[in-house]
């Protein structure tokens, strides 16, 4: 179910509240999953819709919940997650960020997780990252890199991060596993995006379209040829000899 893909991914982002809108079953299991996964430190809230909401819309209820969460929890952003029933009846929460912009001063993201259009959690993960580009700012000067798609702890221990730090390459954001909303808003000043998981490809493509930031896709599979070619591209773009650091033979690649 894409709902759980969103919970898996978006809950990494610091001080961002998730508001799940759906039946009591959807909201309960989403909250329960997040609560146990994060040992009670999650920021997942529920708006359980009733029969009257199906008939007359739950939009007012969702807006009220958002305002209450902002008042009591002071999050840096809110992600509204629409599930199957709201999608079936045609509820459209995508306009919430515009209708609330005069009342709240934080980003309000909206992610649709209708299970009847897909049969996996991966689309939810991808959508929850892709929507983040809507909060990014425009910058003239480009510097450093972003890591997109890393969703485990201890990113500092990865080979990629160690190499970047060794050569004093600025790391603007690691999305989603180690970032704040401010990091996300400033991620568009990067010179390059390094994608380490396919769930972040849609985000990388969106950033390419909006901000003309190129990306390199490493993938998570251990393929030496792919790794070597990607480090060769990195060396070309960032003007650093990563291949020598790794003891890899130089290869000829075409950089876009």
Features from the language model and the residues they span:
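An N-terminal assembly and electron-transfer interface module characteristic of large anaerobic redox
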Residues: 1-256
């Amino acid at each position: 179910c894409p709902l759980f893909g969103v919970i898996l991914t978006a809950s990494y982002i610091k001080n961002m509240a998730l508001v799940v809108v759906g039946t009591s079953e959807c909201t309960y299991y989403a909250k329960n999953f997040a609560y146990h996964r994060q040992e009670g430190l999650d920021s997942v809230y529920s708006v359980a819709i009733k029969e009257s909401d199906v008939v007359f819309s739950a939009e007012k209820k969702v807006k009220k919940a958002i305002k209450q969460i902002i008042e009591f929890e002071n999050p840096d952003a809110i992600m509204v997650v629409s599930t199957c029933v709201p999608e079936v009846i045609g509820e459209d929460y995508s306009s919430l960020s515009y209708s609330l912009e005069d009342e709240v001063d934080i980003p309000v993201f909206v992610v649709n997780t209708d299970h009847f259009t897909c049969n996996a959690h991966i689309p939810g993960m991808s959508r929850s990252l892709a929507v983040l580009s809507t909060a990014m700012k425009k910058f003239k000067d480009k510097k450093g890199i972003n890591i997109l798609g890393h969703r485990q702890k201890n990113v500092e221990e990865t080979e990629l991060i160690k190499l970047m730090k060794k050569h004093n390459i600025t790391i603007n954001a690691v999305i989603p596993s180690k970032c704040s909303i401010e990091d996300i808003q400033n991620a568009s000043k990067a010179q390059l995006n390094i994608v380490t998981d396919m769930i972040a490809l849609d985000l990388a493509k969106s950033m390419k379209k909006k901000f003309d930031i190129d990306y390199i896709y490493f993938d998570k599979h251990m393929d030496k040829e792919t790794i070597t070619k990607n480090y060769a591209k990195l060396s070309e773009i960032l003007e650093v000899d990563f291949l020598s650091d790794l003891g890899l033979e130089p290869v000829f690649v075409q950089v876009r």
